[in-house]
Amino acid sequence: MFRQIPKFSVIRASCFASRCFYSSKSSNATYIASLLAEYDKTTNRSKKPRLKSRNDPKPSFKGAKAKKPDRHINQTGKERDREALKVVLDEVQSKYKSNNAIVILPTGNLEETQLSKTSLTLNLDEHGLQVVGEKKDSKGRSVPLVKVVDRQTAIKNYSDYLHQQVTRKFSSSFRKAINTSNVANKDPWKVIKVSWNISPQDLASQKCNEIEQMLNKGQNVYILIGSKGVINKSIDNPEDLFNEQHKREVSLDDIEALRRQKIVDTLDSMLETLPTSSIGNDGSISDKIIYKIKAQPKKDDKDEKKRLKELKKQERQEKIRLRTEKKRAESKA
């Protein structure tokens, strides 16, 4: 509402600068009014808008710009139709490393062209592509033979592709789990050989510790006690040593019989303290003795079986989901 009035010092300085002095009040008032008018002109002149310069920063606009559609991608049809087309193009590119193809048109005619151009001219609401084979082009090169098919066939092929991917994924996981389980159980029975000539110290420190370690790992164990001629043989199945042709019983004096019996008693005492699910033995101290010891199943084995069962369940659920989705897509088509 009120106009800004210059300070009196500015007005007074202007008076002396013009070498004018007014004695009367009216004359001074007139002169002050003229100074105010001149001040207004100067102020308004300085407030004129400045012309834009090329160095002025460009104004920034908030918000993302709308993304332009890619002119190299077919924009017709639904997203599923475009995904089905992309699978065919990727398959051709990965196998042939080329864009050339021979296309079977809906009319039945063959056209040697670039597959990317053909894909852009398709109306995906009505048609799709399918690789049906391989053919030599005019230059003698092997190129894919691609057929223009109806939309329903293209969607069915895409559903089959997804089903194969899921099956391959779960089969790979299942095979990996099976291989891991097989590696763990590659040698389900370990043969530990003990000579009748072993010293009590070696039996207690070496052989007993070896047996204990195997059983604690969940490893099933054969313990074969015999003469050096028996334990040095290559043995596939220790139980085969106890048929009639392998029996070689010898007469023992009291000292040797007592020593061998002590070895057997030491093993029996040790096995009572170890984690076993079953213990069986056969033979006699006058020939050879075999222990068949089955270890308690480890907790890891149970967890592994549970994981394999869960993988199978997931695979079944995924197959059902894909089958349902495939039927839904075919019904819409």
Curated annotation (Swiss-Prot):
Look up the transit peptide and give its residue range.
1-28
Coiled-coil stretches, from where to where?
none
Principal localization reads mitochondrion
Please indicate if the UniProt record lists Isomerase as a keyword: no
Which InterPro entries does the UniProt record give? AIM23
Q: What is the annotated localization of this protein?
A: Mitochondrion
The alphabetized UniProt keywords are: Mitochondrion, Transit peptide
Composition skew (Basic and acidic residues), residue ranges:
71-80, 297-333
GO CC terms of this entry = mitochondrion
Location of region: Disordered: 43-80, 296-333
Q: What family does the Swiss-Prot or TrEMBL record give for this protein?
A: Belongs to the AIM23 family.
Q: What is this protein called?
A: Altered inheritance of mitochondria protein 23, mitochondrial
